Regions:
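Periplasmic peptidoglycan-binding/tethering modules of Gram-negative envelope proteins
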Residues: 1-57, 114-120, 125
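Periplasmic OmpA-like peptidoglycan-binding domain that tethers envelope proteins to the cell wall
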Residues: 38-40, 61-125
Length: 125
């Protein structure tokens, strides 16, 4: 997986998106917050970008598919965000102050359920 960076015009507001890393998601198996080794390359590429651009931060937003209860989906989406953040911080040494975490529960962003089981990565100011 290669992460391409696209510069976007954005207002100067706090936490506004200034870059989007492509692909912008780390995907997960159903009811899992374990990062699959095939998805870790996306985390690695994100970390390399952060090391090359020490003035940027990331917003990680966790999602779940439509299966399960609202409560269960909120829990799993939060666990997914924490898994990605923990890897970025613990394994790769990025300062936790450069990470903003959020979780939304159910996502209908994509037509395929398996694509909605993800953490969306956005580079922010």
């Amino acid at each position: 997986t290669v992460v391409n960076v696209v510069r976007q015009e954005a207002p100067a507001a706090e936490n506004s998106v200034i870059f989007k890393a492509l692909p912008t998601t780390i995907n997960f198996a159903f009811n899992s917050s374990k990062i699959d080794p095939t998805q870790e390359v996306g985390v690695y590429n994100l970390v390399q970008f952060m090391k090359e651009n020490p003035d940027v931060r990331v917003r990680l937003t966790g999602f779940a598919d439509k299966r399960g209860t609202e409560k269960a989906n909120m829990i799993i989406s939060e666990r997914r965000v924490n898994a990605v953040a923990d890897m970025v911080i613990s394994k790769y040494g990025i300062n936790k102050d450069r990470i903003v975490k959020d979780h939304k529960g159910v996502s209908s962003r994509y037509d395929k359920d398996e694509w909605n089981r993800c953490v969306l990565v956005e580079i922010i100011k």
